[in-house]
A protein has these predicted regions:
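N-terminal secretory signal peptides that target proteins for export/translocation
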Residues: 1-34
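Intrinsically disordered/low-complexity terminal segments and short unstructured peptides
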Residues: 7-8, 15, 24, 43-45, ...
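Bacterial N-terminal signal peptides
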Residues: 38-49
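Flexible loop/hinge segments at secondary-structure junctions
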Residues: 55-382
């Protein structure tokens, strides 16, 4: 039997909210003999409609990834463009960073995508070493739905932490109004919208809050999944964006591209230098202008950059360093490495238009070095 995975997505702009806020994957079994005898065409939603010439060629040119919803708008564009020039089909499941790493651990996907570096516990669950390749940088923005207010609010680290701790409960609280003079903020109750799944976006946001608020660090901490003091959970950036849009008084955290594509307001956040910074590709780039360690695992939250947006983060493609496993072919392994190399080089040209920051030369250099360490049967692929 052949197992086909179908990724069902909305054909509107990537990240645009539809009635179904969750992406779904279906498993369908096909009989090889039935396909041979009937000569049937099996239609699957991928980034290509071109059928390969042979089964082995098809396997080599089909790559499956899963993970970060933070990356989904960018990945949709990248994988479509890559298919045009190579014929390689990339099927990507926007299931959240945690689920993506779980699927990589189980070896049911070729790569995982995560906005959080793997933890020691996650590393120990792998059957072999994995590498993290930075592929983009983005911003986690604070979006809200305040009746009658479309202004870009100013928020300090302390006020933001206390909102999510549940100690600031209405929009006309004196601490919020003092930062936003001239804005008529209503007495509407604040409702927190947060992620319900394991999330790299959550990791970026809670890492930031743990750095700027001792109360948050003590009571909640940081991670891809935390015990939220208050609020409602949504699955994926799509789900949280939907909760915010549908709920008067709501506030939540989502990736910048989702906010812009869905015309959602978002706050300027005060950074270490005391400046209120609007999240943008320029302010993300400024935050990312820091030394990159050899393993690429670095946080971009609350950096010293004078013009940097303080809730920024890298997103990584994660793959096994040794690619000879589960009967994989060398051709498939080579196509995976070539894909990731293209993403950090030619693929960067698509970042700005989708509100992601292109990688710095330093990040690309580290990514290149890591890709050169990937092997098949102990021999370097590149």
């Amino acid at each position: 039997m052949v197992l086909a995975k179908l990724l069902i997505i909305d054909f509107s702009l990537p990240g645009t909210i539809s009635n179904d806020l969750n992406f779904k994957t279906m498993n369908i079994n096909f009989s090889r003999s039935a396909i041979r005898l009937a000569g049937a065409f099996v239609a699957t939603l991928t980034f290509s409609m071109i059928a390969p010439a042979s089964a082995s060629c098809q396997d080599d040119k089909e790559i499956l990834g899963a993970g970060s919803s933070f990356d989904y708008p960018l990945f949709t564009k990248l994988f479509s463009e890559y298919n045009k020039v190579t014929g390689v089909q990339v099927n990507y499941q926007s299931v959240g960073s945690g689920a993506g790493i779980s699927q990589l651990t189980a070896k049911t996907v070729d790569f995982g995508a995560s906005d959080a570096p793997m933890s020691g516990k996650q590393d120990s669950a792998l059957s072999g070493p994995a590498i993290h390749i930075p592929v983009t940088a983005g911003a986690v923005v604070i979006s809200y739905n305040i009746p009658g207010v479309t202004n870009a609010l100013n928020l300090t680290p302390g006020v933001l932490a206390d909102i999510f701790l549940g100690t600031i409960t209405t929009w006309n609280d004196a601490r919020i109004t003092a930062l936003n003079k001239g804005v008529a903020l209503p007495a509407t109750a604040i409702l927190i919208a947060h992620r319900s799944d394991g999330s790299g976006t959550t990791n970026i946001f809670t890492t930031y809050l743990a750095k700027v608020s001792a109360d948050w660090n003590t009571k909640v901490g940081k991670g891809s999944a935390v015990n939220w003091p208050a609020g409602l959970g949504g699955k994926g950036n799509e789900g949280v964006a939907g909760l915010i849009k549908q709920t008067p008084g709501a506030i939540g955290y989502i990736e910048l591209a989702y906010a812009i594509q869905n015309s959602m307001p978002f706050a300027s956040i005060q950074n270490k230098s005391g400046k209120f910074i609007v999240p943008s590709t320029a302010s993300i780039t400024a935050a990312a202008n820091i030394p990159i360690p050899a393993d690429s695992k670095v946080s971009l939250t609350n950096t010293d950059a004078a013009d940097g947006y303080p809730i920024s983060g890298f997103s990584w493609v994660v793959l096994y360093k040794e690619q000879n496993y589960n009967g994989r072919s060398q051709g498939k392994a080579a196509n995976l490495v070539k894909l990731v190399s293209w993403m950090i080089h030619s693929g960067q040209q698509y970042s700005n238009a989708l509100n992601y920051a292109p990688l710095s030369p330093a990040a690309v250099k580290v990514g290149d070095a890591l890709l050169k360490s990937v092997t098949f049967g102990g021999k370097s692929i590149l």
